[in-house]
Amino acid sequence: MGDIEKQTEIREKKARNVMRELKIQKLCLNICVGESGDRLTRAAKVLEQLTGQTPVFSKARYTVRTFGIRRNEKIAVHCTVRGPKAEEILEKGLKVKEYELYKENFSDTGNFGFGVQEHIDLGIKYDPSIGIYGMDFYVVLDRAGRRIAKRRRAPGRVGPSHRVEREESIKWFQQKYDGIILPPKPKVKRTFHRRR
């Protein structure tokens, strides 16, 4: 047996290892309205209809006068979904995006996110009293054994070989959802005119 054959055999064993399989740890849904009041409560209703859970309000970290935001004012609403319900909602969101994402959507830690412009595309019936809201999807991927880093008693560290990386999460997305990774968006060149 040559070196190359041994390496391919080791790769195959790693691929079959149950502990190496990627899974969805959680799905975070976020609607940022940018103001408190009626629009924010309507956005909360949208998330409640979609997830069946009561969403949580997010507060502004500091005052921004140009946006008319005060510190500790409720400006956004978010919800964390886990388990099979998370997979079901993610499937709806990816269907809206036609299973197409950019490489920039994936982070170095193996998580990814994307946005949907209209919540009615997710299969929620349009209600004129609520209106139309867009939302952000954030997906956190992990492997079995993550708990050792999070537990209270005798916490350990997840080794670098067991951490999820960008390339692995892209491969998982392509295999599980037959996803397409789009080429990077062309960067717009800005021309600056000098004053004479």
From Swiss-Prot:
One of its GO terms (cellular component) is cytosolic large ribosomal subunit. It comes from the Eukaryota. Coiled coil: none annotated. It is found in: Nucleus; Cytoplasm. Pfam families: Ribosomal_L5 (PF00281), Ribosomal_L5_C (PF00673). InterPro entries: Ribosomal_uL5, Ribosomal_uL5_C, Ribosomal_uL5_CS, Ribosomal_uL5_dom_sf, Ribosomal_uL5_N. The keyword Hydrolase does not apply. One of its GO terms (molecular function) is RNA binding. Keywords: Cytoplasm, Nucleus, Ribonucleoprotein, Ribosomal protein, RNA-binding, rRNA-binding. Disruption phenotype: RNAi-mediated knockdown results in a growth defect. Its main location: nucleus. The keyword tRNA processing does not apply. SUPFAM superfamilies: RL5-like. Disulfide bonds: none annotated. One of its GO terms (biological process) is translation. Component of the large ribosomal subunit. PANTHER family: 60S RIBOSOMAL PROTEIN L11-RELATED (PTHR11994). Belongs to the universal ribosomal protein uL5 family. There's a functional difference between the two L11-encoding proteins in C.elegans. rpl-11.1 plays a role in the germline whereas rpl-11.2 has a somatic function. Component of the ribosome, a large ribonucleoprotein complex responsible for the synthesis of proteins in the cell. The small ribosomal subunit (SSU) binds messenger RNAs (mRNAs) and translates the encoded message by selecting cognate aminoacyl-transfer RNA (tRNA) molecules. The large subunit (LSU) contains the ribosomal catalytic site termed the peptidyl transferase center (PTC), which catalyzes the formation of peptide bonds, thereby polymerizing the amino acids delivered by tRNAs into a polypeptide chain. This is Large ribosomal subunit protein uL5B. It comes from Caenorhabditis elegans. The lineage of its organism: Eukaryota, Metazoa, Ecdysozoa, Nematoda, Chromadorea.
